[in-house]
Protein backbone atom coordinates (compact mmCIF):
# COMPACT_ATOMS: atom_id res chain seq x y z
CA UNK A 1 0.00 0.00 0.00
CA UNK A 2 1.39 3.39 -0.95
CA UNK A 3 -0.15 6.84 -0.57
CA UNK A 4 1.19 10.07 -2.11
CA UNK A 5 0.51 13.74 -1.26
CA UNK A 6 1.60 17.07 -2.79
CA UNK A 7 5.34 17.84 -2.83
CA UNK A 8 7.03 21.20 -2.30
CA UNK A 9 10.54 22.40 -3.12
CA UNK A 10 11.94 20.85 0.05
CA UNK A 11 11.87 17.04 0.13
CA UNK A 12 12.95 14.60 2.73
CA UNK A 13 13.66 11.23 1.22
CA UNK A 14 14.59 7.89 2.57
CA UNK A 15 16.72 5.66 0.43
CA UNK A 16 19.19 2.93 0.80
CA UNK A 17 21.39 2.91 3.87
CA UNK A 18 24.74 4.57 3.80
CA UNK A 19 23.69 8.02 2.51
CA UNK A 20 25.25 10.91 4.48
CA UNK A 21 22.88 13.70 5.51
CA UNK A 22 23.30 16.99 3.70
CA UNK A 23 21.09 20.04 3.42
CA UNK A 24 21.23 22.57 0.58
CA UNK A 25 19.66 26.04 0.59
CA UNK A 26 18.96 27.98 -2.55
CA UNK A 27 17.69 31.58 -2.39
CA UNK A 28 15.83 33.16 -5.28
CA UNK A 29 15.39 36.89 -4.75
CA UNK A 30 13.42 37.51 -7.90
CA UNK A 31 10.28 35.66 -6.83
CA UNK A 32 10.95 35.38 -3.10
CA UNK A 33 10.46 31.60 -3.30
CA UNK A 34 13.02 29.57 -1.43
CA UNK A 35 13.84 26.08 -2.66
CA UNK A 36 15.11 23.69 -0.03
CA UNK A 37 16.17 20.23 -0.83
CA UNK A 38 18.01 17.52 0.94
CA UNK A 39 19.94 14.65 -0.40
CA UNK A 40 18.48 11.26 0.10
CA UNK A 41 19.22 10.04 3.55
CA UNK A 42 18.01 7.37 5.88
CA UNK A 43 16.44 8.57 9.03
CA UNK A 44 15.50 5.03 9.88
CA UNK A 45 17.71 2.11 10.12
CA UNK A 46 17.74 -0.77 7.76
CA UNK A 47 14.36 -2.35 7.40
CA UNK A 48 13.43 -4.75 10.12
CA UNK A 49 13.70 -8.24 8.86
CA UNK A 50 12.00 -10.81 10.86
CA UNK A 51 12.75 -14.31 10.19
CA UNK A 52 10.21 -16.84 11.16
CA UNK A 53 10.72 -18.59 14.35
CA UNK A 54 11.98 -21.95 13.90
CA UNK A 55 9.66 -24.08 15.95
CA UNK A 56 10.38 -27.62 16.66
CA UNK A 57 6.98 -29.10 16.74
CA UNK A 58 8.25 -32.52 17.33
CA UNK A 59 10.05 -31.63 20.58
CA UNK A 60 7.54 -28.92 21.38
CA UNK A 61 10.34 -26.32 21.77
CA UNK A 62 9.96 -22.64 20.74
CA UNK A 63 12.96 -20.93 19.16
CA UNK A 64 13.05 -17.24 20.04
CA UNK A 65 15.98 -16.44 17.79
CA UNK A 66 13.79 -14.22 15.61
CA UNK A 67 12.80 -12.18 18.64
CA UNK A 68 16.39 -11.70 19.78
CA UNK A 69 17.48 -10.78 16.23
CA UNK A 70 14.72 -8.21 16.00
CA UNK A 71 15.70 -6.71 19.33
CA UNK A 72 19.36 -6.53 18.31
CA UNK A 73 18.50 -4.84 15.04
CA UNK A 74 16.23 -2.39 16.83
CA UNK A 75 18.92 -1.63 19.42
CA UNK A 76 21.47 -1.01 16.69
CA UNK A 77 19.01 1.21 14.87
CA UNK A 78 18.33 3.23 18.00
CA UNK A 79 22.06 3.59 18.67
CA UNK A 80 22.73 4.86 15.15
CA UNK A 81 19.80 7.23 15.37
CA UNK A 82 21.04 8.50 18.73
CA UNK A 83 24.52 9.19 17.34
CA UNK A 84 23.00 10.85 14.30
CA UNK A 85 20.71 12.98 16.45
CA UNK A 86 23.65 14.02 18.64
CA UNK A 87 25.56 15.15 15.55
CA UNK A 88 22.52 16.98 14.25
CA UNK A 89 22.00 18.61 17.65
CA UNK A 90 25.64 19.75 17.72
CA UNK A 91 25.33 21.15 14.23
CA UNK A 92 22.05 22.76 15.15
CA UNK A 93 23.62 24.32 18.28
CA UNK A 94 26.53 25.66 16.21
CA UNK A 95 24.05 27.05 13.68
CA UNK A 96 22.08 28.68 16.49
CA UNK A 97 25.26 30.28 17.87
CA UNK A 98 26.17 31.45 14.41
CA UNK A 99 22.67 32.82 13.91
CA UNK A 100 22.82 34.66 17.23
CA UNK A 101 26.21 36.10 16.37
CA UNK A 102 25.00 37.15 12.93
CA UNK A 103 21.83 38.63 14.40
CA UNK A 104 23.92 40.63 16.85
CA UNK A 105 26.20 41.77 14.05
CA UNK A 106 23.11 42.54 12.01
CA UNK A 107 21.69 44.66 14.82
CA UNK A 108 25.00 46.49 15.18
CA UNK A 109 25.15 47.12 11.45
CA UNK A 110 21.52 48.23 11.40
CA UNK A 111 22.21 50.64 14.26
CA UNK A 112 25.32 51.91 12.52
CA UNK A 113 23.44 52.22 9.26
CA UNK A 114 20.60 54.10 10.95
CA UNK A 115 23.13 56.36 12.61
CA UNK A 116 24.84 56.97 9.28
CA UNK A 117 21.49 57.54 7.57
CA UNK A 118 20.08 59.72 10.32
CA UNK A 119 23.01 61.77 11.49
CA UNK A 120 26.27 61.55 9.62
CA UNK A 121 25.19 62.42 6.08
CA UNK A 122 23.13 65.44 7.16
CA UNK A 123 25.78 66.67 9.59
CA UNK A 124 28.52 66.05 7.08
CA UNK A 125 26.49 67.83 4.43
CA UNK A 126 25.95 70.78 6.79
CA UNK A 127 29.65 70.89 7.61
CA UNK A 128 30.52 70.65 3.93
CA UNK A 129 28.02 73.38 3.03
CA UNK A 130 29.27 75.58 5.89
CA UNK A 131 32.90 75.13 4.88
CA UNK A 132 31.94 75.67 1.26
CA UNK A 133 30.11 78.89 2.16
CA UNK A 134 33.08 80.01 4.27
CA UNK A 135 35.47 79.25 1.42
CA UNK A 136 33.20 81.09 -0.99
CA UNK A 137 33.09 84.08 1.36
CA UNK A 138 36.87 84.02 1.59
CA UNK A 139 37.16 83.71 -2.18
CA UNK A 140 34.72 86.63 -2.59
CA UNK A 141 36.75 88.65 -0.10
CA UNK A 142 39.95 87.80 -1.92
CA UNK A 143 38.34 88.70 -5.24
CA UNK A 144 37.19 92.02 -3.78
CA UNK A 145 40.69 92.62 -2.38
CA UNK A 146 42.17 91.67 -5.71
CA UNK A 147 39.82 94.06 -7.52
CA UNK A 148 40.69 96.81 -5.05
CA UNK A 149 44.39 96.14 -5.50
CA UNK A 150 43.96 96.13 -9.26
CA UNK A 151 42.21 99.51 -9.03
CA UNK A 152 45.02 100.81 -6.82
CA UNK A 153 47.54 99.33 -9.24
CA UNK A 154 45.80 101.08 -12.15
CA UNK A 155 45.74 104.34 -10.20
CA UNK A 156 49.41 103.93 -9.33
CA UNK A 157 50.15 103.08 -12.95
CA UNK A 158 48.32 106.26 -14.01
CA UNK A 159 50.21 108.28 -11.39
CA UNK A 160 53.41 106.63 -12.52
CA UNK A 161 52.66 107.54 -16.13
CA UNK A 162 51.94 111.13 -15.07
CA UNK A 163 55.16 111.24 -13.08
CA UNK A 164 57.08 109.74 -15.97
CA UNK A 165 55.64 112.40 -18.29
CA UNK A 166 56.48 115.04 -15.73
CA UNK A 167 59.95 113.56 -15.41
CA UNK A 168 60.38 113.69 -19.15
CA UNK A 169 59.21 117.31 -19.19
CA UNK A 170 61.51 118.21 -16.32
CA UNK A 171 64.33 116.33 -18.01
CA UNK A 172 63.68 118.32 -21.17
CA UNK A 173 63.64 121.54 -19.14
CA UNK A 174 66.82 120.44 -17.41
CA UNK A 175 68.42 119.72 -20.77
CA UNK A 176 67.29 123.11 -22.05
CA UNK A 177 68.59 124.76 -18.88
CA UNK A 178 71.90 122.95 -19.25
CA UNK A 179 72.05 124.06 -22.88
CA UNK A 180 71.28 127.64 -21.82
CA UNK A 181 73.85 127.30 -19.07
CA UNK A 182 76.42 126.11 -21.55
CA UNK A 183 75.49 129.01 -23.83
CA UNK A 184 75.76 131.43 -20.91
CA UNK A 185 79.05 129.89 -19.95
CA UNK A 186 80.28 130.45 -23.46
CA UNK A 187 78.99 134.02 -23.31
CA UNK A 188 80.64 134.48 -19.91
CA UNK A 189 83.84 133.03 -21.23
CA UNK A 190 83.65 135.35 -24.23
CA UNK A 191 82.84 138.30 -21.96
CA UNK A 192 85.73 137.39 -19.68
CA UNK A 193 87.97 137.10 -22.71
CA UNK A 194 86.73 140.44 -24.02
CA UNK A 195 87.27 141.96 -20.60
CA UNK A 196 90.79 140.63 -20.47
CA UNK A 197 91.37 141.94 -23.96
CA UNK A 198 89.91 145.32 -23.01
CA UNK A 199 91.99 145.41 -19.85
CA UNK A 200 95.01 144.65 -21.94
CA UNK A 201 94.00 147.39 -24.38
CA UNK A 202 93.52 149.76 -21.44
CA UNK A 203 96.94 148.87 -20.15
CA UNK A 204 98.36 149.32 -23.62
CA UNK A 205 96.60 152.67 -23.96
CA UNK A 206 97.80 153.71 -20.53
CA UNK A 207 101.31 152.73 -21.54
CA UNK A 208 100.86 154.60 -24.79
CA UNK A 209 99.53 157.65 -22.87
CA UNK A 210 102.45 157.47 -20.50
CA UNK A 211 104.77 157.12 -23.46
CA UNK A 212 103.10 160.03 -25.21
CA UNK A 213 103.34 162.03 -22.00
CA UNK A 214 107.01 161.22 -21.81
CA UNK A 215 107.47 162.06 -25.49
CA UNK A 216 105.51 165.25 -25.01
CA UNK A 217 107.52 166.18 -21.96
CA UNK A 218 110.69 165.32 -23.83
CA UNK A 219 109.57 167.44 -26.75
CA UNK A 220 108.55 170.23 -24.41
CA UNK A 221 111.88 169.99 -22.69
CA UNK A 222 113.71 170.00 -26.01
CA UNK A 223 111.59 172.89 -27.25
CA UNK A 224 112.20 174.71 -24.03
CA UNK A 225 115.89 174.10 -24.36
CA UNK A 226 115.76 175.22 -27.97
CA UNK A 227 113.81 178.25 -26.97
CA UNK A 228 116.24 179.01 -24.21
CA UNK A 229 119.15 178.55 -26.61
CA UNK A 230 117.46 180.72 -29.21
CA UNK A 231 116.64 183.30 -26.56
CA UNK A 232 120.22 183.37 -25.41
CA UNK A 233 121.36 183.60 -28.98
CA UNK A 234 118.90 186.31 -29.69
CA UNK A 235 119.85 188.12 -26.56
CA UNK A 236 123.42 187.93 -27.57
CA UNK A 237 122.94 188.78 -31.15
CA UNK A 238 119.86 190.86 -31.40
CA UNK A 239 118.38 192.31 -28.39
CA UNK A 240 115.19 193.37 -30.01
CA UNK A 241 111.82 193.21 -28.30
CA UNK A 242 110.04 191.70 -31.36
CA UNK A 243 111.87 188.30 -31.09
CA UNK A 244 110.83 187.82 -27.51
CA UNK A 245 107.27 188.39 -28.41
CA UNK A 246 107.56 185.93 -31.26
CA UNK A 247 109.04 183.33 -28.95
CA UNK A 248 106.31 183.86 -26.46
CA UNK A 249 103.79 183.50 -29.20
CA UNK A 250 105.45 180.30 -30.41
CA UNK A 251 105.66 179.01 -26.86
CA UNK A 252 102.02 179.78 -26.33
CA UNK A 253 101.13 178.01 -29.54
CA UNK A 254 103.12 174.91 -28.58
CA UNK A 255 101.66 174.91 -25.08
CA UNK A 256 98.17 175.25 -26.52
CA UNK A 257 98.86 172.40 -28.93
CA UNK A 258 100.27 170.24 -26.11
CA UNK A 259 97.35 171.04 -23.84
CA UNK A 260 94.86 170.24 -26.61
CA UNK A 261 96.62 166.98 -27.40
CA UNK A 262 96.72 166.16 -23.69
CA UNK A 263 93.05 166.90 -23.28
CA UNK A 264 92.11 164.88 -26.39
CA UNK A 265 94.20 161.95 -25.19
CA UNK A 266 92.68 162.08 -21.71
CA UNK A 267 89.18 162.38 -23.11
CA UNK A 268 89.78 159.43 -25.48
CA UNK A 269 91.21 157.42 -22.62
CA UNK A 270 88.31 158.32 -20.35
CA UNK A 271 85.77 157.43 -23.05
CA UNK A 272 87.46 154.13 -23.82
CA UNK A 273 87.79 153.30 -20.14
CA UNK A 274 84.12 154.17 -19.54
CA UNK A 275 83.07 152.03 -22.50
CA UNK A 276 85.13 149.11 -21.29
CA UNK A 277 83.86 149.58 -17.74
CA UNK A 278 80.25 149.63 -18.97
CA UNK A 279 80.84 146.52 -21.08
CA UNK A 280 82.49 144.77 -18.15
CA UNK A 281 79.63 145.77 -15.86
CA UNK A 282 77.08 144.57 -18.37
CA UNK A 283 78.92 141.25 -18.83
CA UNK A 284 79.30 140.86 -15.06
CA UNK A 285 75.58 141.43 -14.54
CA UNK A 286 74.77 138.91 -17.26
CA UNK A 287 77.25 136.52 -15.69
CA UNK A 288 75.65 136.96 -12.26
CA UNK A 289 72.19 136.40 -13.76
CA UNK A 290 73.43 133.31 -15.61
CA UNK A 291 75.02 131.98 -12.42
CA UNK A 292 71.82 132.69 -10.49
CA UNK A 293 69.70 130.94 -13.11
CA UNK A 294 72.16 128.03 -13.18
CA UNK A 295 71.92 127.74 -9.40
CA UNK A 296 68.11 127.87 -9.59
CA UNK A 297 68.04 125.22 -12.28
CA UNK A 298 70.48 123.11 -10.29
CA UNK A 299 68.28 123.35 -7.20
CA UNK A 300 65.19 122.48 -9.28
CA UNK A 301 67.00 119.52 -10.82
CA UNK A 302 68.09 118.30 -7.40
CA UNK A 303 64.51 118.63 -6.07
CA UNK A 304 63.08 116.83 -9.08
CA UNK A 305 65.75 114.14 -8.77
CA UNK A 306 64.81 113.63 -5.12
CA UNK A 307 61.11 113.47 -6.04
CA UNK A 308 61.90 111.03 -8.83
CA UNK A 309 63.92 108.77 -6.52
CA UNK A 310 61.14 108.90 -3.93
CA UNK A 311 58.53 108.03 -6.54
CA UNK A 312 60.71 105.23 -7.87
CA UNK A 313 61.06 103.84 -4.35
CA UNK A 314 57.31 104.10 -3.79
CA UNK A 315 56.63 102.45 -7.14
CA UNK A 316 59.05 99.59 -6.40
CA UNK A 317 57.52 99.13 -2.94
CA UNK A 318 53.99 99.06 -4.35
CA UNK A 319 55.00 96.67 -7.12
CA UNK A 320 56.70 94.42 -4.55
CA UNK A 321 53.58 94.51 -2.34
CA UNK A 322 51.43 93.74 -5.38
CA UNK A 323 53.61 90.75 -6.31
CA UNK A 324 53.56 89.50 -2.72
CA UNK A 325 49.78 89.85 -2.55
CA UNK A 326 49.37 88.07 -5.90
CA UNK A 327 51.65 85.25 -4.73
CA UNK A 328 49.84 85.02 -1.38
CA UNK A 329 46.49 85.08 -3.16
CA UNK A 330 47.66 82.33 -5.54
CA UNK A 331 48.90 80.24 -2.59
CA UNK A 332 45.66 80.75 -0.63
CA UNK A 333 43.59 79.97 -3.73
CA UNK A 334 45.58 76.77 -4.29
CA UNK A 335 45.11 75.87 -0.61
CA UNK A 336 41.36 76.47 -0.84
CA UNK A 337 41.17 74.41 -4.01
CA UNK A 338 43.10 71.60 -2.31
CA UNK A 339 40.74 71.82 0.68
CA UNK A 340 37.69 71.68 -1.58
CA UNK A 341 39.17 68.73 -3.49
CA UNK A 342 40.00 66.98 -0.20
CA UNK A 343 36.47 67.54 1.10
CA UNK A 344 35.02 66.26 -2.14
CA UNK A 345 37.27 63.19 -1.89
CA UNK A 346 36.16 62.65 1.71
CA UNK A 347 32.53 62.98 0.67
CA UNK A 348 33.11 60.50 -2.14
CA UNK A 349 34.86 58.12 0.28
CA UNK A 350 31.99 58.45 2.76
CA UNK A 351 29.49 57.78 -0.01
CA UNK A 352 31.45 54.72 -1.09
CA UNK A 353 31.74 53.57 2.52
CA UNK A 354 28.02 54.09 2.99
CA UNK A 355 27.33 52.12 -0.18
CA UNK A 356 29.65 49.40 1.07
CA UNK A 357 27.86 49.32 4.43
CA UNK A 358 24.54 49.13 2.62
CA UNK A 359 25.85 46.27 0.50
CA UNK A 360 27.17 44.49 3.60
CA UNK A 361 23.87 45.08 5.31
CA UNK A 362 22.04 43.66 2.31
CA UNK A 363 24.39 40.66 2.29
CA UNK A 364 23.81 40.15 5.99
CA UNK A 365 20.08 40.38 5.43
CA UNK A 366 20.43 37.72 2.76
CA UNK A 367 22.53 35.57 5.11
CA UNK A 368 20.02 36.13 7.89
CA UNK A 369 17.21 35.17 5.56
CA UNK A 370 19.07 32.02 4.53
CA UNK A 371 19.79 31.21 8.18
CA UNK A 372 16.17 31.81 9.10
CA UNK A 373 15.23 29.40 6.34
CA UNK A 374 17.76 26.84 7.62
CA UNK A 375 16.51 27.29 11.17
CA UNK A 376 12.96 26.75 10.03
CA UNK A 377 14.11 23.76 8.02
CA UNK A 378 15.96 22.27 10.99
CA UNK A 379 12.96 22.95 13.16
CA UNK A 380 10.82 21.00 10.74
CA UNK A 381 13.49 18.33 10.53
CA UNK A 382 13.49 17.99 14.29
CA UNK A 383 9.74 17.81 14.33
CA UNK A 384 9.94 15.19 11.58
CA UNK A 385 12.59 13.28 13.56
CA UNK A 386 10.41 13.32 16.64
CA UNK A 387 7.48 12.02 14.66
CA UNK A 388 9.73 9.45 12.96
CA UNK A 389 11.15 8.20 16.25
CA UNK A 390 7.69 7.26 17.42
CA UNK A 391 7.09 5.17 14.28
CA UNK A 392 9.37 2.17 15.01
CA UNK A 393 7.98 1.80 18.52
CA UNK A 394 4.46 1.77 17.22
CA UNK A 395 5.48 -0.68 14.52
CA UNK A 396 7.26 -2.79 17.05
CA UNK A 397 4.14 -2.99 19.15
CA UNK A 398 2.27 -4.12 16.08
CA UNK A 399 4.36 -7.28 15.89
CA UNK A 400 2.17 -10.24 16.66
CA UNK A 401 3.29 -13.65 17.66
CA UNK A 402 0.56 -16.05 17.05
CA UNK A 403 1.98 -18.77 19.22
CA UNK A 404 3.20 -17.58 22.57
CA UNK A 405 3.02 -20.76 24.55
CA UNK A 406 4.33 -24.25 24.16
CA UNK A 407 0.93 -25.68 23.49
CA UNK A 408 -0.17 -23.13 21.02
CA UNK A 409 0.36 -23.23 17.34
CA UNK A 410 2.80 -20.71 16.08
CA UNK A 411 2.24 -19.18 12.75
CA UNK A 412 4.99 -20.02 10.37
CA UNK A 413 5.86 -16.38 9.62
CA UNK A 414 5.83 -13.15 11.55
CA UNK A 415 4.60 -10.16 9.62
CA UNK A 416 6.40 -6.80 10.14
CA UNK A 417 4.76 -3.57 9.05
CA UNK A 418 6.89 -0.60 8.02
CA UNK A 419 5.62 2.95 7.66
CA UNK A 420 7.58 5.86 6.06
CA UNK A 421 6.35 9.43 6.52
CA UNK A 422 7.78 12.24 4.32
CA UNK A 423 6.85 15.79 5.32
CA UNK A 424 7.42 18.62 2.82
CA UNK A 425 7.58 22.24 4.05
CA UNK A 426 7.64 25.34 1.78
CA UNK A 427 8.70 28.63 3.40
CA UNK A 428 8.96 32.22 2.24
CA UNK A 429 10.72 34.98 4.25
CA UNK A 430 10.98 32.64 7.23
CA UNK A 431 7.24 31.84 7.26
CA UNK A 432 5.68 28.50 6.40
CA UNK A 433 3.35 28.95 3.49
CA UNK A 434 2.78 25.31 2.52
CA UNK A 435 3.19 22.00 4.27
CA UNK A 436 2.48 18.54 2.89
CA UNK A 437 2.96 15.01 4.17
CA UNK A 438 3.51 11.82 2.21
CA UNK A 439 3.09 8.48 3.95
CA UNK A 440 4.17 5.16 2.53
CA UNK A 441 3.23 1.84 4.04
CA UNK A 442 5.06 -1.19 2.73
CA UNK A 443 3.95 -4.74 3.38
CA UNK A 444 6.62 -7.42 3.31
Curated annotation (Swiss-Prot):
Residues in IF rod domain copies: 81-389
Biological processes annotated in GO: intermediate filament organization; regulation of chaperone-mediated autophagy
Subcellular localization, as worded in the UniProt entry: Cytoplasm, Cytoskeleton
SMART domains: Filament (SM01391)
Region described as Tail: spans on this chain: 390-444
Superkingdom, taxonomy of origin: Eukaryota
SUPFAM superfamilies: Intermediate filament protein, coiled coil region, Myosin rod fragments
Region of interest: Coil 1B: 128-226
Chain positions covered by the region annotation Linker 12: 227-242
Coil 2A: annotated segments: 243-264
GO CC annotations, alphabetized: cell projection; cytoplasm; intermediate filament; type III intermediate filament
Cytoplasm among keywords: yes
MF terms in GO: structural constituent of cytoskeleton
Similarity annotation: Belongs to the intermediate filament family.
Quaternary structure annotation from Swiss-Prot or TrEMBL: Forms homodimers.
Protein name listed in UniProt: Glial fibrillary acidic protein
Species name: Danio rerio
Organism lineage: Eukaryota, Metazoa, Chordata, Craniata, Vertebrata
Chain's gene name: gfap
Amino acid sequence: MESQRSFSSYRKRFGTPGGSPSVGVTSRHSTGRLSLHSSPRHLTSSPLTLSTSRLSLGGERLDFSADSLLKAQYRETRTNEKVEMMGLNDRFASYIEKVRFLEQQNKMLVAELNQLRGKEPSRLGDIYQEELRELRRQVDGLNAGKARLEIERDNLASDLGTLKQRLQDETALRQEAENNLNTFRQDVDEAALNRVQLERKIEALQDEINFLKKVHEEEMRELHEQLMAQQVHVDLDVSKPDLTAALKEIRAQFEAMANSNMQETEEWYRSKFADLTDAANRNGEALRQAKQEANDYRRQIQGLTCDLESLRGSNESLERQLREMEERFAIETAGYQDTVARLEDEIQMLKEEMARHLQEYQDLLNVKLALDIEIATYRKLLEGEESRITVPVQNFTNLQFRDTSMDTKLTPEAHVKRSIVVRTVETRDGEIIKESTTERKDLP
